C-alpha cells in the first residue's frame, strides 16, 4: 500500500458505515472508492461483499493490496459513479444492499501536485479525476469571459467571479495559463481576503474542478442510478463537502420521500409513492475530535435514506448550469 493511501482518512467513516449497516452476504457499493476507507470498514463485516468504483485509474491500481486481503470479496471497476447501475449489472449484482458515496476530490489527489488540483502546490493546471477529456487549462484557455464568470459564480459561489474572469482573460492574452500557481496568483490579484480567511483562489479552483469533472451532473445521475439499483430496505449514504452538493442530495431525498402531488385530473399513482424513507432528519456532521484529526471533515455533511419497495421516480435530467460540452464548443467570445 502506498504512503498516499495509508495517509487518507475517510470522512465520517464510522457514521457512514453505521447507517449502511452491512451484514454477511450483503452486496455494497463504494461508489467513490478513492483510498478505500469505506470499503475497509464494510469488509470488516465477515461475508460482506464490496463493489468499488472510481474513475481515477491510479486509485484502482493502488488498491491491489486491499483486493488481495479481501480474498474475493472486493471487486474494483474503473468508471464514473454515475454509471453505478451498469457497473453493478456487469458484476451480476443488479440489486444491492447499500451504496455509499463521498463527493468531491480526495486527499490523495490534492496531495499530488502533478494532478493539478491544489493551489498550495505548483503543478500542471489539470484537475481531471479520470485523466480524460478537457483539463482546467483547456477551459481557462478556451472559455469566454462570460462563461468563465458563470462557471466561477455558479460552481464556486465566488462573488468576485466577474473580476476573476476578466483577470484570467487579460492574463491569457499575454501567455497561456498552464500551472496552478500562475492561476492562483491571477485570482489573488483581484480577490483580497483577510489573514484568517480561506485562500483567495479556493472558490475559483473548486469551480473549475467541479466543472471539468461535471461533478454535479455526475451526482444527479448517481443518485438516480442508486434509486434503480438498491433493493427494498437497501440504504443510500452520501457525504458532501459544500452547499451545492448537499442541496442536490437533500432535494433528491426529500422529493423521493414524499408522495408525488396529484390532481383531480391525475390522482396519485403507485409510481409516485415514496421510493425512500429519510434516515437523517438533519445532516450528520463531524465532531470536534474528527475535525482536529482531519480538517477536511469540517465542512462534511452526511445524509442517509432507506429504499422502499415502491417504484423509482422519473429521473430529472434538466440541469440549469453551464455544461462542459457547450462551453468548450462555444469557445471565446
UniProtKB/Swiss-Prot annotation:
Claim: Nucleus is one of the keywords in the record: no
Gene Ontology molecular function: rRNA (cytosine-N4-)-methyltransferase activity
Q: What is this protein called?
A: Ribosomal RNA small subunit methyltransferase H
Which residues does S-adenosyl-L-methionine bind?
36-38, 54, 81, 102, 109
Q: Which family does it belong to?
A: Belongs to the methyltransferase superfamily. RsmH family.
Q: What class of enzyme is it?
A: transferase
| Catalysis: reaction(s) | cytidine(1402) in 16S rRNA + S-adenosyl-L-methionine = N(4)-methylcytidine(1402) in 16S rRNA + S-adenosyl-L-homocysteine + H(+)
Listed InterPro entries: RsmH, SAM-dep_MeTrfase_MraW_recog, SAM-dependent_MTases_sf
Q: What is its EC number?
A: 2.1.1.199
List localization entries: Cytoplasm
Q: One matching Pfam family, short form?
A: Methyltransf_5
Q: Which GO terms describe its biological process?
A: rRNA base methylation
Gene3D superfamilies documented for this protein: Putative methyltransferase TM0872, insert domain, Vaccinia Virus protein VP39
Main function: Specifically methylates the N4 position of cytidine in position 1402 (C1402) of 16S rRNA.
Establish whether keyword Aminoacyl-tRNA synthetase is in the entry: no
Q: Which GO terms describe its cellular component?
A: cytoplasm
The superkingdom listed in its UniProt entry is: Bacteria
| Alphabetized UniProt keyword annotations | Cytoplasm, Methyltransferase, rRNA processing, S-adenosyl-L-methionine, Transferase
Amino acid at each position: 500500500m502506498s504512503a498516499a493511501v495509508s495517509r487518507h482518512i475517510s470522512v465520517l467513516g464510522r457514521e457512514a458505515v453505521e447507517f449502511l449497516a452491512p451484514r454477511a452476504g450483503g452486496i455494497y457499493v463504494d461508489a467513490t472508492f478513492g483510498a478505500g476507507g469505506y470499503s475497509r470498514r464494510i469488509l470488516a463485516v465477515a461475508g460482506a461483499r464490496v463493489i468499488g468504483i472510481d474513475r481515477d485509474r491510479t486509485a484502482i491500481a493502488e488498491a491491489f493490496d486491499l483486493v488481495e486481503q479481501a480474498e474475493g470479496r472486493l471487486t474494483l471497476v474503473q468508471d464514473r459513479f454515475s454509471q453505478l447501475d451498469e457497473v453493478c449489472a456487469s458484476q451480476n449484482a443488479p440489486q444491492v444492499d447499500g451504496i455509499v458515496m463521498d463527493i468531491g476530490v480526495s486527499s490523495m489527489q490534492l496531495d499530488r501536485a502533478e494532478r493539478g488540483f491544489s493551489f498550495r502546490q505548483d503543478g500542471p493546471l489539470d484537475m481531471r479525476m479520470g485523466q480524460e477529456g478537457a483539463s482546467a487549462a483547456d477551459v481557462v484557455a478556451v472559455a469566454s469571459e462570460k462563461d468563465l464568470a458563470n462557471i466561477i459564480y455558479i460552481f464556486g459561489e465566488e462573488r468576485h467571479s466577474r473580476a476573476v474572469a476578466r483577470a484570467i482573460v487579460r492574463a491569457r492574452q499575454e501567455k497561456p495559463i498552464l500551472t496552478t500557481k500562475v492561476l492562483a496568483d491571477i485570482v489573488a490579484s483581484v480577490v483580497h481576503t483577510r489573514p484568517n480567511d480561506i485562500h483567495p483562489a479556493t472558490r475559483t479552483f473548486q469551480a473549475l474542478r467541479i466543472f471539468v469533472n461535471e461533478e454535479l451532473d455526475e451526482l444527479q445521475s448517481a443518485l438516480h442510478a442508486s434509486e434503480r439499483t438498491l433493493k427494498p430496505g437497501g440504504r443510500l449514504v452520501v457525504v458532501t463537502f459544500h452547499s451545492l452538493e448537499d442541496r442536490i442530495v437533500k432535494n433528491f431525498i426529500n422529493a423521493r420521500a414524499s408522495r408525488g402531488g396529484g390532481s383531480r385530473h391525475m390522482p396519485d399513482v403507485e409510481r409516485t409513492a415514496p421510493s425512500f424513507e429519510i434516515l437523517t432528519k438533519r445532516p450528520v456532521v463531524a465532531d470536534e475530535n474528527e475535525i482536529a484529526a482531519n480538517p477536511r471533515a469540517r465542512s462534511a455533511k452526511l445524509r442517509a435514506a432507506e429504499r422502499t419497495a415502491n417504484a423509482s421516480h422519473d429521473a430529472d435530467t434538466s440541469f440549469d448550469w453551464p455544461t462542459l460540452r457547450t462551453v468548450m464548443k462555444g469557445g471565446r467570445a
